[in-house]
Amino acid sequence: MKAQPKASHFIDGEYVEDTDGTVIESLYPATGEVIARLHAATPAIVERAIAAAKRAQPEWAAMSPMARGRILKRAADIMRERNRVLSELETLDTGKPIQETVVADPTSGADAFEFFGGIAPAGLNGSHIPLGQDFAYTKRVPLGVCVGIGAWNYPQQIACWKAAPALVCGNAMVFKPSENTPLGALKIAEILHEAGLPKGLFNVIQGDRDTGPLLVNHPDVAKVSLTGSVPTGRRVAAAAAGNLKHVTMELGGKSPLVVFDDADLDSAVGGAMLGNFYSTGQVCSNGTRVFVQKTIKDEFLKRLKVRTEAMLIGDPMDEATQVGPMVSWAQREKVISYIEKGKAEGATLIAGGGIPNNVSGEGYYVQPTVFADVTDDMTIAREEIFGPVMCVLDFDAEDEVIARANASEFGLSGGVFTADLTRAHRVVDRLEAGTLWINTYNLCPVEIPFGGSKQSGFGRENSLAALEHYSELKTVYVGMGPVVAPY
């Protein structure tokens, strides 16, 4: 098989196999071919991973932030040296085109290790509080054992985005990738340990929806960070609340992208395409509700149709391919069902809408699809599709579009295209979302916080803000004089 790992799990610095677990077949989305067979973690494997993390964490926390950061930066260097190999593995794992993975996936993961490794000495400072004769100080301390639960759209990136801040704060992590994309996280574990990470600090176990509760409910776990769907997030948050665990949730969205009539039209079309078709539309922050001012709608749709139909769909390993398959057969069927709902509910199909005829019939392909004349009450405008389906809605005025954009249970992200920067700032101030873009879309460098509001989650990934979610403040009051007691 093309990508068979040494074993299913990586625990305490070594590969571990346990064939008692349910078989997980890793399928190449472009062909449906089995490229690896792994096993889900049994309860014994879960216990072993958490025990290793708990055992290793105190000594790691006692190291200086500089020493911890040095290891992460070394891991970043190794990832960059092996970018091509990691990118090819990511393409096999997800089906995303190699032209995407070589610039986006391992690269972003390496950036996370470099960023958090570099800010460790300065980012983990406390404060000094003068109190007259006395004083107090605060310090940031690690939480302990953290659990990371990944999604299947950016498996390597997500593993690094969670591991980097957790480790630099002095925690240990047990990471469970999606059963659809089990391979990348194992390579990240290898690289971290090659870079000098002590054993037991980053463990990877495979599993499905039955494995997550074993991790989330474990009494030795202090923190859970999930990237996934809203229903999964609700279940995990409810379980974590029972033991008062720290939680970060990066969930789904149905984000608005607003195009005003003074926008650079080609840039707006390009932004809408990036915000709907990159990674075959499997991006949580996608601006899938594209609100276009009526005066430019026809020209916007004309240019969008031409560019969408010119996209190259094909073999993800071909450097020319711009659109790959969905991650799984089930996801493709879900997307096709939403396209059919859009047609049935009266939306106008502008481009795509089916399965391309130039690819393997065994692959999980869907054409990039554009609907116009979409109304706010249509299913495709309300529910997260998580595929290459763009909904174009029209509007007249600013107040109107803001109210409609906010009329959603989600609040992950949003965007505005306009030449009027005063209006741009005014609009983003009123949009109910955690991450917003002006005259661009879906750029997420590790230097900036990323996360949502409302049903799209809470907490933040990346930037200095992430340190707050993998540590807690300890306050120390220092008395400098005799104790005065009334008794």
Curated annotation (Swiss-Prot):
* Top-level taxonomy: Bacteria, Pseudomonadati, Pseudomonadota, Alphaproteobacteria, Hyphomicrobiales
Documented EC number(s): 1.2.1.8
Recorded protein name is: Betaine aldehyde dehydrogenase
| NCBIfam families the record matches | BADH, PRK13252.1
Cofactor(s) the record lists:
K(+)
Query: Which Gene Ontology molecular-function terms are recorded?
Result: betaine-aldehyde dehydrogenase (NAD+) activity; metal ion binding
Residues bound to K(+) 1 are 26, 93
Q: How is the cofactor bound?
A: Binds 2 potassium ions per subunit.
Organism field: Rhizobium johnstonii (strain DSM 114642 / LMG 32736 / 3841)
